[in-house]
């Protein structure tokens, strides 16, 4: 075969692996020759969208990444913030969207496993998981199948490994029918001095692979699944979905934490997307060193695996560490006690090259800089659409429906109904840190006392894809402020944010516009709040022949509060408490709302602008009042508007309320917009909020009464709110 023919064959192979012609030619230039099969496989993963962020990296540089509480920022396995008493909270959110759309149970389960490893890879013990989920309408059999599988997978992994699932969100919209979203967030706790980074260090030090054997599961996950659109052949991609074993991960977790306590590790990295290819390249790049890896030493689960398969396998429950040679015996002793496999598979070298050996034979030799830093970054070509690209939702409620019928319809809609049938599948109190559980408060609250700390932390995760589809900038501003509002409701000050940007194909102008405007909205709002991004994830190409998903930036925020016992609940807790409406003066509107969806209205091409500075000041006031101890109830007015928030507060503990609103119009009681809260407590605590709080009524009775609008018994409200349970029958 001629050299030209060989080049054509290799180029065809590169295309099949997701590389374009320009990228392949650039690889040849950086290598000084054509890559062989092993090298091409590694490059195809390291230069995939999932690993290289080639359509989003330039945008991400606009986000603020510095703050007074920040200990570890973007670029590490997870970010970390200080919470005082020498303690750190590490946290991150990541997506497992495409695998979950192909095989929902394993896709979601391994998504949880992966985010857990990210957290203990920096030396933190995982203490909580949250999830943000999106599916098509539940009238679809496929959506019910995906929901059931994903929720079961999350519960299986989290419950088995002993980490509580303390919060989350789930929404059902048509554009997620083919591309569900499964975003998992984890936070962990560590002493500040135990945090460890992933940079390989010390020429001559050993590279040790710990954990499960390596198999063929997950091969191509980063390129085949995570960096391309789904199509009708997605069932054929099931072999690229990883298989998880939470019990293996539990042993691995405890083993790694003990090794860190002993000071045995120089660096630690989990094996996630792209397996050994990514983990080793990133460790070498951050440490400015090289690595030699002998794939013949890697423990295998299957016979006759080729070197390239070993390098790109995404088998789960594996970690890579660097240790000094004299620490090997100690590591093997600890791993033996935890029944964790540990094999020295290579060493740190001087040259900044990743060499792959199969015994004595060198089967791959690549410059680390080319793998990690030289992937081309593409400029987006954004263009705002002249008309809405998403179809109007199906009408299920006539626009002539009165307030009584409208509230019941909203509460029974799958987007607003009680999530109890879902979160009851999760253990939310294991580890005995959880003080505020799902539907107990607007944010989860976990005490620090078991770890020797003072006070508590709060965490929330939020997204609002339909609102972002209406207006990518303002919708994202609302998502960030909503997350901060949830923390304010329990008296927590935000310390840091992690994000997951779920979008369609960035090569399409309208998706590029959505992505660019969304990042701009997030950056501007975070600077206004003074909150840094500690890390995150970008998931692109979430679309199919039906079109793109709603643009869905998901944000997770961690905050600190001085006393967990004082954290207000979202529901009314005592008869005779005064009820007040706290408002930042933001106009509540119906376009883009849950009510507009039920009415089958077209999505608007814009939302009212939000003054983030005004809302920030409101959040400061609410946070201060929540910490004072006099407010028993603080509930953010979000989806469905004020009437839904009042109904939720009534249903939490079966206490009614009688209120009189300054504006009883449908727009005012069902419209949406950030910056409003329902609060309840003793008169002095409510009045302490000053002019921001307008007393609107009292708690008591067995119904919700809104003067001039109507009344609803708690029985009929609860029956409507239980609609999601009926959907599972």
Which positions does each model-derived feature cover?
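Glycine-/charge-enriched secondary-structure boundary and capping motifs
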Residues: 5-17, 21-23, 34-40, 178-180, ...
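N-terminal amphipathic, basic-rich helices that act as targeting or association modules
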Residues: 6-82
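Non-catalytic terminal/interface segments that mediate subunit docking, oligomerization
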Residues: 47, 51, 60-110, 114-120, ...
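Short, hydrophobic beta-strand segments that form beta-sheet elements in well-ordered domains
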Residues: 49-52, 165, 187, 678-681, ...
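Mobile "lid/hinge" segments at catalytic clefts and subdomain interfaces of large enzymes
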Residues: 76-340, 348-353, 357, 372, ...
């Amino acid at each position: 075969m001629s050299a030209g023919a060989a080049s054509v064959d290799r180029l065809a192979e590169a295309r099949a692996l997701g590389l374009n012609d320009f990228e392949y030619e650039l690889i040849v230039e950086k290598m000084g020759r054509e890559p062989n099969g092993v090298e091409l496989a590694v490059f195809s993963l390291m230069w995939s969208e999932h690993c290289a962020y080639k359509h989003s990296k330039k945008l991400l540089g606009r986000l603020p990444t510095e703050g007074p509480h920040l200990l570890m920022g973007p670029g590490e396995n997870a970010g970390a913030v200080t919470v005082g008493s020498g303690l750190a909270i590490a946290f991150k959110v990541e997506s497992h969207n495409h695998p979950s759309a192909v095989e929902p149970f394993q896709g979601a389960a391994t998504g949880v496993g992966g985010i857990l490893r990210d957290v203990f890879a920096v030396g933190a013990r995982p203490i909580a998981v949250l999830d943000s989920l999106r599916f098509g309408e539940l009238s679809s059999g496929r959506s019910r199948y995906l929901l059931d599988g994903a929720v079961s997978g999350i519960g299986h992994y989290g419950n088995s490994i002993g980490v509580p699932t303390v919060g989350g969100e789930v929404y059902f919209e048509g554009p997620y029918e083919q591309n569900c979203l499964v975003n998992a967030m984890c936070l962990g706790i560590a002493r500040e001095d135990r945090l460890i980074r992933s940079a390989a260090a010390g020429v001559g030090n050993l590279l040790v692979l710990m954990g499960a054997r390596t198999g063929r599961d997950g091969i191509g996950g980063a390129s085949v699944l995570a960096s391309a659109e789904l199509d009708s052949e997605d069932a054929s991609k099931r072999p690229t979905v990883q298989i998880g074993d939470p019990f293996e991960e539990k042993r691995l977790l405890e083993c790694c934490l003990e090794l860190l306590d002993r000071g045995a590790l120089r660096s630690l990295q989990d094996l996630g997307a792209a397996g050994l290819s990514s983990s080793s390249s990133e460790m070498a790049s951050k440490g400015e060193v090289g690595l030699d890896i002998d794939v013949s030493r890697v423990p295998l689960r299957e016979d006759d695996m080729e070197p390239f398969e070993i390098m790109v396998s995404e088998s789960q429950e594996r970690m890579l560490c660097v240790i000094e040679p004299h620490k090997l015996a100690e590591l093997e002793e600890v791993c033996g006690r935890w029944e964790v496999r540990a094999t020295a598979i290579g060493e740190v070298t001087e040259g900044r090259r990743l060499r792959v050996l199969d015994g004595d034979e060198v089967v791959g030799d690549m410059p680390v800089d080319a793998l990690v830093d030289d992937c081309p970054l593409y400029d987006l070509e954004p263009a705002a659409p002249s008309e809405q690209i998403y179809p109007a939702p199906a009408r299920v409620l006539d626009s002539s429906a009165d307030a009584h019928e409208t509230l019941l319809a909203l509460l029974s809609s799958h987007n607003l109904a009680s999530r109890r049938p879902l979160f009851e599948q999760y253990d939310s109190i294991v580890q005995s840190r959880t003080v505020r559980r799902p539907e107990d408060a607007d944010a989860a609250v976990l005490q620090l006392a078991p770890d020797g700390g003072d006070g508590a932390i709060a965490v929330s995760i939020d997204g609002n894809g339909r609102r972002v589809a209406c207006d990518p900038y303002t919708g994202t501003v609302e998502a960030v402020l909503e997350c901060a509002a949830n923390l304010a409701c329990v008296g927590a000050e935000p310390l840091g944010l992690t994000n997951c940007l779920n979008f369609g194909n960035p090569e399409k102008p309208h998706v590029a516009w959505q992505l660019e405007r969304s990042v701009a909205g997030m950056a501007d709002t975070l600077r206004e709040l003074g909150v840094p991004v500690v890390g995150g994830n970008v998931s692109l190409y979430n679309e199919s022949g039906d079109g793109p998903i709603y643009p869905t930036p998901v944000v997770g925020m961690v905050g600190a509060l001085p006393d967990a016992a004082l954290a207000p609940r979202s529901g009314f807790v005592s008869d005779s408490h005064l009820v007040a409406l706290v408002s930042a003066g933001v106009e509540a509107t119906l376009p883009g709302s849950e009510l507009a969806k039920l009415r089958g209205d077209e999505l608007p091409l814009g939302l009212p602008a939000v003054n983030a500075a005004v809302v920030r000041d409101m959040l400061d006031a609410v946070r201060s009042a929540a910490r004072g101890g006099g407010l028993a109830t603080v509930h953010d007015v979000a989806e469905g508007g004020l009437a839904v928030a009042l109904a939720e507060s009534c249903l939490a503990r079966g206490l009614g309320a009688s209120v009189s609103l300054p504006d009883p119009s449908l727009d005012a009681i069902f419209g949406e917009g950030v910056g409003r809260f329902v609060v309840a407590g003793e008169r002095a605590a409510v009045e302490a909020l000053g002019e921001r709080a307008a007393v609107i009524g009292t708690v008591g009775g067995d119904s919700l009464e809104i003067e001039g609008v109507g009344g609803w018994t708690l029985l009929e409200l609860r029956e409507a709110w239980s609609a999601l349970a009926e959907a599972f029958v």
